[in-house]
Curated annotation (Swiss-Prot):
Reaction(s) this enzyme catalyzes, per UniProt: succinate + ATP + CoA = succinyl-CoA + ADP + phosphate; GTP + succinate + CoA = succinyl-CoA + GDP + phosphate
Alphabetical list of NCBIfam families matching this protein: PRK00696.1, sucCoAbeta
Keyword Metal-binding: yes
Gene: sucC
Function description: Succinyl-CoA synthetase functions in the citric acid cycle (TCA), coupling the hydrolysis of succinyl-CoA to the synthesis of either ATP or GTP and thus represents the only step of substrate-level phosphorylation in the TCA. The beta subunit provides nucleotide specificity of the enzyme and binds the substrate succinate, while the binding sites for coenzyme A and phosphate are found in the alpha subunit.
Chain positions recorded as Mg(2+) binding sites: 199, 213
Protein name (database record): Succinate--CoA ligase [ADP-forming] subunit beta
Complex and partners: Heterotetramer of two alpha and two beta subunits.
Domain ATP-grasp: start-end pairs: 9-244
Family matches, as HAMAP family: Succ_CoA_beta (MF_00558)
Length: 388
């Protein structure tokens, strides 16, 4: 789950990480009121969407008068902001953050992620913060410093101080940087975040260390113990189909292809998509029905896939371990009839009650294309999607 910048800053504030004063706004009138409350002479009008690259996309503007606040708020609110993270379709801006201006002397970068190799937390920091951190990572990776933090110990004072000095924080400001780094780490750990990023973390002219931006991603599997994080959820920023899928406990992610995939198990789902691509096809979605699929869940899964106007074929790939193949067959038959399926359907089933499931499909009278192996299934669905 992702949240907005201003929400991330609320979290940072709770963990004693210095952030600028700011007020969210949902209208031009609220933006003007926020600017008046903050006082001038400089404000920053920032689009709030779940994507980076807002500055380059025209979603962040510095205003030096109330008239400029009004102009920028009017221009940004309601615009479709296209960045390198939104894709060409962009995201509509429904809210703003009006923030006090800052005296920026130096922009730094710091982030925390889970390092799967070490099974610990990786702290990454750079002296080259700001809008072009992707360029730094691509062309001068030596400027990015990485520290592996043992979660049983946490980020120690000496480690934080060392990282701060490596990214160019002057000695007089190192204690402030330590506070910011340790606060960010604590926020990351205690909220079950999968990513916590400050870009930029700035040094001001008078030596202060301030988080000028904040980005958090959270482990969705841990949200049950964080109602305060769930309260930040903005459904306008999420894919409508993914929201609908979550109501039926389906793991669904929209993709750009034309072949629908219905699979049980995330690993098998990814392998299925890889195999489709291997034979020249493009998956339209990731869809994991899990180990407890019912007729209702399978029907809803079909409905979700068929909402895609570009869908040309569907592949159902099931391994019957916990999930019995006859139950899936029953669901596929019922779903096909319920939605009046009009695209080719390829089904491959292996495992518990496999023969019974296959017989049910064969006797259903539906034009289902059977396959025995994953390779055969992928080849058949790619051909069907191409009209062959």
């Amino acid at each position: 789950m992702n949240i907005h910048e201003y929400q991330g800053k609320e979290i940072l504030r709770k963990y004693n990480v210095p952030v600028p004063r700011g007020i969210p706004a949902f209208s031009v009138e609220e933006a003007l009121k926020a600017a008046e409350t903050l006082g001038g002479p400089v404000w920053v009008v920032k689009a709030q969407i779940h994507a980076g690259g807002r500055g380059k996309g025209g979603g962040v503007k510095v205003a030096k008068s109330m008239d400029e606040v009004k102009t920028y708020a009017s221009n940004i609110l309601g615009m479709t902001l296209v960045t390198h993270q939104t894709g060409p379709e962009g995201k509509k801006v429904n809210r703003l953050l009006i923030e006090e201006g800052a005296d920026i002397k130096k922009e730094l970068y710091v982030s925390l992620v889970v390092d799967r190799v070490s099974q610990k937390v990786a702290l990454m920091a750079s002296s080259e913060g700001g809008m072009d951190i992707e360029e730094v990572a691509a062309h001068t990776p030596e400027k990015i410093h990485t520290l592996i933090v043992d979660p049983q110990i946490g980020l120690q004072d000496a480690e934080a101080d060392d990282i701060a000095r490596k990214i160019g924080v002057p000695d007089a400001s190192v204690p402030q940087a330590r506070q910011a780094l340790q606060g960010l780490y604590k926020a990351f750990w205690e909220t079950d975040a999968s990513l916590a990023e400050i870009n930029p973390l700035i040094l001001t002219g008078d030596g202060k260390v301030i988080a000028l931006d904040a980005k958090f991603n959270f482990d969705s599997n841990a949200l049950f113990r964080h109602p305060e994080i769930v309260a930040y959820r903005d459904l306008d920023e999420e894919d409508a189909n993914e929201i609908e899928a979550s109501k039926f406990d389906l793991a669904y992610i929209s993709l750009d292809g034309n072949i629908g995939c219905l699979v049980n198990g995330a690993g098998l789902a990814m392998a299925t998509m890889d195999t489709i691509k291997l034979f020249g096809g493009e998956p339209a979605n990731f869809l994991d029905v899990g180990g407890g699929a019912t007729t209702e869940k399978v029907t809803e899964a079909f409905k979700l896939m068929l909402k895609n106007p570009g869908l040309k074929a569907i592949l159902v790939n099931i391994f019957g371990g916990i999930m019995r193949c006859d139950v899936i067959a029953e669901g596929v038959i019922a779903a096909s009839k319920a939605v009046s399926l009009s695209v080719p359907l390829v089904v491959r089933m292996k495992g518990t009650n496999e023969d019974l499931g296959k017989k049910m499909l064969a006797d259903s009278g539906l034009p289902i294309i059977a396959a025995d192996t994953m390779e055969e299934a992928a080849q058949k669905v790619v051909a069907a999607a191409a009209g062959k």
